[in-house]
Amino acid sequence: MQITDVRVRRVSKEGKMKAVVSITLDNEFVVHDIKVIEGEKGLFIAMPSRKAGDGEYRDIAHPINSITRDKIQSIILEKYELAALEGNIEEAE
């Protein structure tokens, strides 16, 4: 699996969420609404989720192993930091 495109959109409000990202896998499948969040230990990603009836949030799509999660997170954070440095982050709606 290759991440063939990463689109970064800045979140305009103040807070821990810094951006919303979409990734394309193998030029065939897109995952929207991956969040870049500032945590106590630095930036991390949160996969798209939905609030369940019990009030808990459940991921809609997510990697099934830590190697894939680390790969996706590394690429997204690299693209986010590069876009932030270059000023190439579009505003999220």
Swiss-Prot record:
The keyword Metal-binding does not apply. The keyword Cell division applies. Keywords: Cell cycle, Cell division, Septation. It comes from the Bacteria. GO terms for biological process: division septum assembly; sporulation resulting in formation of a cellular spore. Belongs to the SpoVG family. Could be involved in septation. This is Putative septation protein SpoVG. It comes from Lachnoclostridium phytofermentans (strain ATCC 700394 / DSM 18823 / ISDg). The gene is spoVG.
